[in-house]
Amino acid sequence: MMKVRNKTRIDGRLYQHSLELKESGPNSKTPGTKFISGNVEIATDNDITNIVTVHYTYVTATTSTGKSNATFNVLKDIIDGKLGSVMANGADNAAVITIDSAIGLNEFFSDRNGKEELVSAKRNEGGFAVVKSSADEDETKRNTFDVDMIITGTRMIEADPEKDLPE
């Protein structure tokens, strides 16, 4: 049986974030649990033009075995401003972070034009976060993925010179 491959590695400077420290509600499995959710954006090139977003849904302070969760600590340091970002502190003062993640789908129904449609947005989902002293010298190794997939359909798009689209 073939093992499914779904790994991404994002390595670069912390660009910005929208992380929040939250607490689970009274109807959750573990009420009152503090957790972090939101997005972290990483600039993977020296020119700060290739920004990759990683989404965290639910990161708690401890792992399922009760040990301290290192990723929670890194994300908490980002929230607390202990780790600088390009937007807040400039590129030279931004933390260098590596995130080992996976590609996931954020599927939901949306009411568009009076008709409910399934929306499937692809995103980097969570993963281990580690603070480093410097990013990989080779920019091509900073944003990598290793996935297997099945292509279920394709479509031909006609060339459009106005939009600079080849056939």
What is the predicted role of each segment?
Residues 1-167:
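OB-fold and OB-like single-stranded nucleic-acid-recognition modules
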